C-alpha cells in the first residue's frame, strides 16, 4: 500500500491502474478512522478495482481554530487499518501541499443556497471549505466513484449537487450510517465523551426515532414537536444545538409536495462533543 503526501506520486500510481482498465474508487476522510470509515472503504471496494483513501484535516472547513488544533490525528493507526482493508493508496497531503498560496488567496468552490442552510447558517464558510477541498481531491484522484457517509446528510447533499452542477463524471454513493449496538452513530467526536457521557449519548438517536414516529401525524405542528424533542434532550443532559425537520431532497421547509422529510439533529454533550445524527422519514407512512 502506497502512503504519500505527494500529488505526482499518487497520480502516477492511479495512472498505472487506469492504463490497465481498472475502475477507481475514492474515500475522502480526515483520519481518526473508525468502523464507519472502514464501512465506506468496503462499500468502495464493491464498486471498483482500486480504492484510494485520503487523510487530510482540512483547515478551510474549520470555523474555530481550537477545533482544528485539537482534531485527533492518528495517521499510523489509520494506515494500519487501511492496509488491512486492502486499500491501494493513502493520500496524506499537508496544508502546504493542498493550499500552497495559503487560504486567503485560494480559489474556492461554493454551492449556492445549500451551503448556508441549516448547519451552514451556524458555521459560515464551513461548507465552502468542504466543497473546495473535495473538488481539489476529485481533480487529483479523478475517481469513477466516491463514497460518503449519510451521517453527514447535508454534506452528502452538497456534494451530490456540486458534482451534478459541475458535470463531474463521478458516481457519488451515500453509505448508511454505522451505529454502535446502543444506536449511537459512530463518529470521531465520540472519542471526546467521558464514560458517563457515553452512556447518555444514545439518547440522541432515541429522541430522533421518537420524532420520526410522531412526524407523519404532526406535520402541521412541527415547532411544538421540535420543542418537545429539545426538552427531552436537555433533560437527559444534552445542550440542544439544532433540530431541523425539512424536505429530504431540497433541505427546504416541508411543503404539501414533500414526500420525505429528514430530521437533522445536533447537540452538545459535555464540553467537547457536538454530536450529529439524521433520519429520513416517509411522510406518507400509515400512522399507528
Curated annotation (Swiss-Prot):
Gene transcribed to yield this protein: panC
Assembly, per entry: Homodimer.
Protein name: Pantothenate synthetase
Annotated EC: 6.3.2.1
Similarity section: Belongs to the pantothenate synthetase family.
Record: residues binding (R)-pantoate: 61, 155
GO cellular component: cytosol
A GO molecular function held by the record: ATP binding
Superkingdom of the organism of origin: Bacteria
DNA-binding keyword on record: no
Chain positions recorded as ATP binding sites: 30-37, 149-152, 178, 186-189
